[in-house]
């Protein structure tokens, strides 16, 4: 996986947050990989999904991550960290597949980057607000105005396999059609994100040592057909190695 090449510079300009135009992400229901369970949550109660593009050598990524940690409890946000892997020589925590997904979706290759609910992106670590904490709080509290609920069930069948079942019960499909980036050509998909709670890498030059919320896999479970009366599905999946 490691490719010997130059590492792109980190971004430190005070760039304002902008919309991505590629559609939203919502959800956040989760279970430990070795535990079965079922969760039903109203869309209005779902956490803000925050994707962080980072690297173990990225010193200003630490400022971004600490700001998110500081507001995590108050805002209820959930963090998912994608570690740089393409042309990477210093960070062993990423994968080419996960890094490529982030680049294909958002077009960014240099950390730090923070994306809120898939629809608003903040590049760099310099805020144009009073602080990163206040800027991130405002972005995390934006309401997507989706009405209805989502049910997610996870049933492990071995240490590395399991069955994921999902269903959504939107009160009004118009609320989904009105989401940022959604048009008549858009599709709605269910995914399982496999996340390692914390990964240790003492050699990380930004000094953290322990790196939380590491995304290890993004597995497509199936397309949700909004014209169908059955907005549900099930899939057998294999977990990626930690």
Give the location of each predicted region.
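Short, thiol/selenol-centered motifs that function as redox-active sites or metal-ligating centers
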Residues: 53-68, 86-88
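Short, conserved sequence motifs used for protein processing/export or organelle targeting and
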Residues: 93-109, 113, 127-242
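Structural recognition of the beta-strand scaffold that forms the well-ordered cores
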Residues: 49-52, 78-83, 112-116
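Short, solvent-exposed loop/turn and secondary-structure capping segments
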Residues: 61-65, 125-127, 203
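Thiol-based oxidoreductase modules, predominantly thioredoxin-like and allied folds used
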Residues: 74-97
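Secretory targeting signatures
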Residues: 1-33, 40-41, 47-50, 58-59, ...
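Extracytoplasmic/secreted envelope proteins and their assembly/folding machinery
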Residues: 50, 64-69, 99, 111
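Conserved glycine-bearing catalytic or ligand-binding loops at nucleotide- and phosphate-handling centers
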Residues: 118, 122-130
């Amino acid at each position: 996986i490691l490719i010997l090449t130059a590492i792109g510079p980190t971004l430190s300009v005070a760039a304002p947050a902008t919309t991505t135009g590629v559609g939203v992400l919502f959800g956040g229901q989760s279970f430990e990989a070795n535990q079965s369970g079922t969760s039903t949550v109203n869309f209005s109660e779902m956490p803000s999904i925050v994707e962080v593009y980072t690297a173990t050598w990225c010193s200003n990524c630490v400022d971004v991550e600490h700001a998110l940690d500081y507001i995590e409890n108050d805002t209820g946000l959930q963090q998912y960290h994608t570690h740089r892997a393409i042309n990477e020589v210093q960070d062993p925590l990423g994968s080419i597949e996960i890094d490529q997904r982030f680049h294909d979706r958002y077009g960014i290759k240099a950390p730090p980057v923070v994306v809120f609910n898939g629809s608003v992106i903040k590049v760099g670590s310099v805020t144009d607000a009073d602080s990163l904490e206040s800027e991130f709080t405002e972005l995390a509290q934006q309401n997507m105005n989706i009405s209805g609920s989502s049910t997610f069930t996870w049933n492990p069948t071995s240490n590395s396999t399991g069955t994921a079942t999902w269903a959504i019960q939107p009160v009004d499909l118009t609320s989904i059609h009105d989401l940022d980036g959604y048009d008549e050509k858009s599709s709605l998909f269910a995914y399982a994100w496999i996340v390692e709670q914390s990964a240790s890498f003492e050699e990380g030059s930004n000094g953290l040592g322990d790196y939380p919320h590491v995304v290890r896999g993004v597995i497509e479970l199936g397309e949700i057909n909004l014209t169908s009366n059955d907005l549900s599905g099930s899939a057998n999946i294999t977990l990626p190695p930690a």
